[in-house]
Every structure is written in structure tokens, then in C-alpha cells.
């Protein structure tokens, strides 16, 4: 699974939290100063890589998640475990419990 950019994660977090939505509805939740095309590009890329999908019958498109938040987090944790702890889950667990 592809690691998302901060902006892509921001969009996904909102859709996971609030459910399916249009690009226009995302803009005020992210940043009113961003142009429609900026958010639209992020959403279309998420659609292209399989994180989002949409219904083609209606305009504006209503985008909904194809990847659950839980699955994405699981993949992130696995990736960190592999990259930094040689897949040793015990070392990983120790690292995140150190205060």
C-alpha cells in the first residue's frame, strides 16, 4: 500500500470521519484559502491509486473510501516495523512504550 502525503492523509481522515463527500464539501474542512482545483487534484489522485472511489452517475462526484482507516494504520505500522526494527515486533513495541 502506498504511503500517503500529509494532504492526502488529511483528505482521507475527513472522509473516514464524516463519510462520503464532494470536493466542495472538503474545502472548508481543510482550508478555505485552498483553490478547488488543488483539493480536486488530491482527491482524483486518491481515486486513481485506489484509496477513494466515486459514483460516476452523479455530478458533483461523491467520493467514498475504498481503504479503511484501520487497514491504512495497520500498513503504516507494518512499514515502520520493517524499516526501523527489521520486522521485530517486540523491539517495535518496546520503542513505542518508552517514555
Report the location of each language-model feature.
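Short helix-capping/hinge SLiMs at alpha-helix to coil transitions
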Residues: 2, 15-19, 67
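Short helix-coil-helix linker/hinge
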Residues: 2-7, 20, 86
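Short, cationic-aromatic polyanion-contact patches
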Residues: 3-7, 57-77
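Pre-recognition alpha-helix immediately N-terminal to the DNA-recognition helix
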Residues: 9-14, 25
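Short acidic, hydrophobic short linear motifs in intrinsically disordered regions
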Residues: 20-30
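Short amphipathic alpha-helical interaction segments
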Residues: 33-45
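Glycine-centered, phosphate/nucleic-acid-interacting loop/turn motifs that mediate DNA/RNA or nucleotide
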Residues: 50
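Amphipathic alpha-helical dimerization/coiled-coil segments
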Residues: 75-99
Amino acid at each position: 500500500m502506498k504511503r500517503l502525503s500529509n494532504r492526502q492523509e488529511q483528505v482521507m481522515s475527513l472522509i473516514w470521519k464524516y463519510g462520503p463527500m464532494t470536493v466542495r464539501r472538503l474545502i472548508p474542512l481543510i482550508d478555505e484559502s485552498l483553490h478547488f482545483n488543488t483539493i480536486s487534484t488530491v482527491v482524483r489522485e486518491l481515486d486513481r491509486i485506489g484509496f477513494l472511489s466515486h459514483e460516476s452517475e452523479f455530478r458533483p462526484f461523491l467520493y467514498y473510501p475504498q481503504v479503511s482507516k484501520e487497514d491504512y494504520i495497520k500498513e503504516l505500522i507494518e512499514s515502520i516495523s520493517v524499516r526501523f526494527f527489521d520486522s521485530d515486533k517486540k523491539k517495535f513495541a518496546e520503542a513505542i512504550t518508552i517514555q
